[in-house]
Amino acid sequence: MQEVYLCLDVGGTEIKAAPLDKRGNFLAPVRHFPAMAGADRQTLLENFGWIFSSICPENAVPIEIDLAFPGPFDYKNGICLLQGLDKYDALYGCNLRRAFSEISGLLEQKIQFINDAAAFALGEMAFGQATQAGRALFVAVGTGCGSAFGVNGFLAEEGTPGVPPNGYFYNAPFRDSCVDDYISRRGLEKLSGEMLGVPLDGRALAERIAAGDERAKACFRCFGEQLCDALQPQIEAFCPDTLCM
């Protein structure tokens, strides 16, 4: 039987997943699954188990499960530390390495985690738009605001000048709150609710813009200005030559 790696990109809205071989080749198209991020712990664990089994090809045996997971998270020990960020609150304090080992039957050391923005950064530095970057800032805006910092093709080491702890600035002070409350899906929904009278996510807002809605365009422009303001302190501190979003 073919040995495969089950790889998941875990977001707050959806989870993208696919099986890969030892060379990193996709063995099937990437599939999209609902994250169910607001569900209870048992439902969430069952959802992950269903995804594991759904993406494993017939006549194949999984030898490792690799997950890009949003932080805060104890990646070394596999413990979820997300709380109060509108996603996966029910998993707070849960040892997901142990839980996924029990679900899949794999040894705990065969369950690996990495920060989702860090995974994005590594991919861009190895294969994408940051292959020639000396200093790169990576930002992933979704359910929250994920971030990572790269130096000469590697993730910036802890303590690198201009890099916040763990490479996170979602919790940095911004206006009357923090970055994550503004540069996120809920931030965009709040802004569109104030400007348009109805909360809209990025896709719905883009559809209105495509239809010629000038108020929706102004809302997106305002969100972009907020993003620029939120990034400015990070850019001034780190001085990147490349910004990937």
Where does each model-flagged region fall?
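Short beta-strand segments
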Residues: D9, D66-P70, I114, F138-G144, ...
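Acidic/histidine-rich catalytic cores of soluble enzymes
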Residues: A121
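A charged helix-plus-loop insertion that forms the helical arch/lid used to bind
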Residues: G78-G93
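Short beta-strand scaffold segments in enzyme catalytic cores
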Residues: I15-P19, C145-G150
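General beta-strand structural signal in soluble alpha/beta enzymes
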Residues: K110-D116
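A short acidic/small-residue loop/turn micro-motif
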Residues: P34-M36, Y88, V163-P165
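ATP-binding/phosphotransfer module of carbohydrate and carboxylate kinases, centering on a glycine-rich
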Residues: M1-E64, F73-I79, F100-Q109, M125-L137, ...
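Short clusters of small/polar residues that mark proteolytic maturation junctions
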Residues: R31-H32, L85, T160
